[in-house]
């Protein structure tokens, strides 16, 4: 709520425009009860049959909160479009931001002036059979249980610490506590149990290993991929051939699925939003995907959550590139804002002459990200899972080595101080909570020479640097992702042996049909495990598989994995090439 001079709504309508703001906790304002009644009266003038309930924190006397007036209407699903249209006529607007409620359960927003103060309004339009009874029960529990109200107050004040925080972080940081109250009230969301079908957007090696883990748990699998012979095809029950922006193909995939997930970030965000319709569970949802597809949005998200990143600037012209490089200091890395993985779509620029040469060869005509190259001690990654109840479980950090942007090796333990490991895992769990993710998130980090951590990038999915978990941890990242998206308890992340290592198997040479040599020698190496991705063709630096090894130390595990990988060669007319590139 903010003080306001008198004004009228857009076009003379009673409801005024809405502005998203950071979250601040204020004392309860009794005027919010009058505001709620005013909104209810406005709606009943148009639709006397509707019951408008005041919910949320402002509906509980004495409970601090953001001051937003939350209201809820329960109706038949077929009535929702007409009710939303009526609300728009009053001046309400569609919910802004990157993570709106689906059209099957919309939340129009607006504001209204009351006694010289502007109040923001969230109006939830809920289908019968949805969460309306739960929200009312939660309100009544808070109204009638002073201890519950005290706990909720302490939680809110603990999140904001007397200041303003990102709205998503504020909302999702309350999830675990709120869902615990729901359970006590008897509202427990049902888990998705076998033999339900899990849909996977993307049929590459990550989709394949997800499918294998899910099938071991008894689930059926449907996959969407442009290639009918993709790696996941041979382990899926159903393959839908289509591109990652083919909405019709995605709907065919979702038909018959209980939950849909994605194995890569190159899926169309509008496509994911369309699937996330409140009928089929889309996990993770559209917001983590949108945010990580856009590097500038990702940087802003990280900074809004108090996470350190490399100094950066947005650039969209040659002049901006020159100025930003001079401000940041060389060397810098110029990255495409959209797209790119495994080091693609980025360029290292070491001095002004290289900037000049790059501009001459490739004019800057779109938004890009320029960041200072970090002088780090090592590269780390943390894979964290967040369940439907908001509980987060993170795997031990892995220490990674890249070659020209492509991951080559990962080892666990990472050989870092206990306090650094604790900080890395806490940071990953905070980010998963801040984006409201359900599933697995991978956080790539730089460990700086002073022991501090800097986030490089995020991936809202299972990740190459987590492959060691298949044999190295009690629960693999793939099984953990399935558990999370299906509403099951998360598994243990304890190591199965003192150390684990993973070495990627990269292709070499020209494109040709896949044949592999040296399997007998590779499999003879003690305590090693070979994973091949069933890719029909091999070519230079293509990820064809990986080797995991266990050992008493990271040196022993890595030596075993390297030895096994060294025996593997890709045959074919263009000549042999080492499997590890």
Regions found by a protein language model. Give the residues of each.
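Helical scaffold of the NTase/Pol beta-like nucleotidyltransferase catalytic core
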Residues: 2-53
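Active-site nucleotide-donor binding segment shared across nucleotidyl transfer reactions
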Residues: 40-82
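Conserved catalytic core of two-metal-ion nucleotidyltransferases
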Residues: 92-130
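Catalytic cores of NTP-dependent nucleotidyl/adenyl transfer enzymes across multiple folds
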Residues: 129-190
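ATP-binding N-terminal substructure of ATP-dependent carboxylate-amine bond-forming enzymes
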Residues: 190-297, 319
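Peripheral (often C-terminal) accessory segments that flank ATP-dependent C-N-forming ligase machineries
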Residues: 194, 483-581
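Active-site nucleotide/adenylate-binding loops and adjacent lid/helix of ATP-dependent enzymes
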Residues: 291-381, 385-404, 408-434
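Active-site "cap" helix and flanking loop/linker of ATP-utilizing ligase/carboxylase catalytic domains
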Residues: 422-443, 449, 459-511
